[in-house]
Each structure stands twice: as C-alpha cells, then as structure tokens.
C-alpha cells in the first residue's frame, strides 16, 4: 500500500522553464488561492508558461500564472485569471532565496503545480538563464540520449 503523505497529482508542468533556465535548486511552496481558483486548478485549467516569482517586502509572489475562470460560477464571483498570488514558504527559506536572488542575480521560476494531500503546491526553482549555445548543447545531449536508447532497444 502506498504512503498517502508522499503521493501527489501533478496538475501542470512548466517544461519551457527547464529549457530556458539552468535549474540550481527547487523549493516546495504553498499558494494562497480563492475557492474558484482551487476548483479551476483541480479541473486542470492552469498555465505556468509565462509565470515567474518575485520577492517583494520579504514575501514571494507568483506573477503572471494563468488560472482560467471557473465555468460553473457566474462572472461576479469569479477570479481574475492573471492576478498576483502569494507563495507560502518558511521564513528561513525566504531568507535563503532573498540572498541568492539579490546577490547572484538568479531568477525564481515555477516548475510545476500539483495537489499534495488535498493542498495545492507549487514547485519553484532558482534558475540561471541559459544562453543560446547552452540551449543548443542541451538539445544535442537529449538527441544523443534518444539515439543511444534506440540503439540499445534494437540489440
């Protein structure tokens, strides 16, 4: 029987972030949401593609992540799709992130959003932007791995 505390369901994955950034360290953060946002997330209507996290006044905010309005409720009770949402982390994690982002010039990007024990969580990462040659190198490495797997499959 699987352990319930370690199981989670991935809602959305930001694959573009792994291509554009060299991921150095990841963190799990809670997110402050309204009821209609949670319902939309459970329905899988979320997009982290253009999203990023920002440090402001000792807090971390998720900006530009798109959560579609919930269809079953009227327009009056619905949420704004691209509103700024607060990320919930421990104080020592926030201090660590502040130091790395301000001193080393790193970026905070959301990698995936998932449900863990009924709570919506966001996996954010400290990333360093890749240059064009780094992107080409990672594509070449991935293609080489595919070729090796194909060759191994035939023999």
From Swiss-Prot:
User: Is the keyword RNA-binding in the record?
Assistant: yes
Mention any one GO cellular component term assigned to this protein in its UniProt record: cytosol
Q: Where is this region: Disordered?
A: 135-155
Q: What is its main location?
A: cytoplasm
MF term (GO), any = RNA binding
* Compartments (UniProt record): Cytoplasm
UniProt-listed CDD domains: SmpB (cd09294)
Write the signal peptide boundaries: none
Carries keyword RNA-binding? yes
Q: Mind listing the UniProt keywords for this protein, alphabetically?
A: Cytoplasm, RNA-binding
A Pfam family assignment? SmpB
Q: Which cysteines in this chain are paired by disulphide bridges? A: none
Family, as annotated:
Belongs to the SmpB family.
Q: State the protein's purpose.
A: Required for rescue of stalled ribosomes mediated by trans-translation. Binds to transfer-messenger RNA (tmRNA), required for stable association of tmRNA with ribosomes. tmRNA and SmpB together mimic tRNA shape, replacing the anticodon stem-loop with SmpB. tmRNA is encoded by the ssrA gene; the 2 termini fold to resemble tRNA(Ala) and it encodes a 'tag peptide', a short internal open reading frame. During trans-translation Ala-aminoacylated tmRNA acts like a tRNA, entering the A-site of stalled ribosomes, displacing the stalled mRNA.
What name goes with this protein?
SsrA-binding protein
């Amino acid at each position: 029987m699987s352990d319930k505390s370690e199981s989670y369901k991935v809602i959305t994955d930001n694959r573009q972030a792994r291509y554009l950034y060299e991921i150095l360290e990841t963190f799990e953060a809670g997110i402050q949401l309204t009821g209609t946002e949670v319902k939309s997330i459970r329905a899988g209507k979320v997009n982290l593609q253009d999203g990023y996290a920002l440090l402001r006044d000792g807090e971390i905010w998720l900006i530009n992540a798109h959560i579609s309005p919930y269809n079953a409720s009227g327009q009056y009770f619905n949420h704004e799709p691209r509103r700024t949402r607060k990320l919930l982390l421990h104080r020592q994690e926030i201090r660590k992130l502040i130091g790395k982002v301000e001193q080393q010039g790193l970026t905070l990007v959301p990698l995936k959003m998932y449900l863990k024990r009924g709570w919506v969580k966001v996996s954010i990462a400290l990333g360093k932007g890749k240059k064009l040659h780094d992107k080409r190198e990672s594509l070449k490495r991935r293609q080489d791995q595919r070729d090796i797997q194909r060759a191994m499959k035939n023999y």
